[in-house]
Amino acid sequence: SDGWNASTLHLYSHSGTHMDAPLHFGVSQETIDQYPLSAFMGRAWVARIPGDCTSKWLQVKDLGAIENKLERGDSLLLQTGWSHHVNDSSYRDALPRISDELAEWCVERGVKILGVEPPSVANVNDLEELSRIHRILLMGGIVIVEGLCNLENLKGESVFFMALPLKVQGGDGAPVRAIA
């Protein structure tokens, strides 16, 4: 009736497509607002992982030809089709997850951003695994983006990728708008 609309938003910092900051797992005190914008964009390789990925440990061998193409500073997007499970309990409870081997490989190769379709890079029901995988990646300086969707629509094996988080002061993470 006044000619305008406005809404109040209440968001969990790790809802939907989101990014984790090192503070999230106590790796350091670095928060989401302290990252430079350059950390959120660049060339990304799309690894298409076929088949049923339910509860699968994702390994370096699953990357296929991408394994030898990725250069230091490139990003890696893992297309598993898992975003299609978003309305099932399996989305959270039976997700494909990053193995220690793949996490360590990403650090050694200097991956800039690791993007996945599930809501986490590790089993959310196993705190030890969840903490271990996040810590390997975050201590290695890798930006983690979780909850991606529509990766199957990306053409080609590499894209220019951006995942821009809300600049939440002191945030342990934030929702992002991801585009490629």
Each language-model region and where it sits:
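Active-/binding-site microenvironments in catalytic and ligand-binding cores
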Residues: 1-180
